[in-house]
Design a protein with these regions (language model features):
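Glycine- and small/polar-enriched repetitive beta-structure motifs of secreted/surface proteins
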Residues: 1-181
Length: 181
């Protein structure tokens, strides 16, 4: 390999590194497919596990950012928690804090924020969503630019042209399932 300043600790950690540099990878199979990415930090079993080329990601927790691997243009993501952003594939500028936050859909959108257990869990292609609170915006799967703050805020929103909604407070917006409200 020609990469510089890499640190890998754990079974299979950083095992495919070629030209990547400045990566710190700790955990079994963490960053094991990382080849050319730079400035990544991963801590936990399979954190950044299938990532190969993107850069400037931080993944802390079991399977956090585990499936990000499809695009060199993805990166600048932060995930902290059990399976946080585990299904993120080509997303960029994503922040996931909490167990399974932004962790259920194959996320390709940009600028999504999920804070809390399963916050924004099913977001797939939507961009610029903000979900803060236990299961806030949990079933949203597309579109974007929604703001859900509070436990279960906009948690049933999931189909159709469902963008530009704002809900603040416990269980706020439960009746919003589709459409712009």
């Amino acid at each position: 390999t020609t990469g510089n300043n890499n640190t890998g600790l754990g079974y299979g950690a950083l095992s495919d590194a070629t030209t990547g540099a400045n990566n710190t990878i700790i955990g079994a199979l963490a960053g094991d497919a990382l080849t050319t990415g730079i400035d990544n930090v991963a801590l936990g079993y399979t954190a950044l596990g299938v990532e190969d080329t993107s850069s400037r990601n931080t993944a802390v927790g079991f399977e956090s950012l585990a499936n990000q691997n499809l695009s060199a243009s993805s990166g600048y993501n932060a995930a902290l928690g059990y399976q946080a952003a585990a299904s993120l594939t080509t997303g960029i500028y994503t922040v996931a804090l909490g167990g399974r936050a932004l962790g259920g859909g194959a996320i390709t959108g940009a600028g999504n924020i999920g804070i809390g257990y399963k916050a924004g869990y099913a977001i797939t292609s939507g961009a610029d969503n903000v979900a803060i609170g236990h299961q806030a915006l949990m079933t949203e799967d597309g579109d974007g630019r929604n703001v859900a703050i509070g436990t279960s805020a906009l948690t049933n929103q999931n189909a159709g042209a469902d963008a530009y909604n704002v809900a603040v407070g416990y269980d706020t917006g439960l009746s919003v399932t589709t459409g712009i409200k």
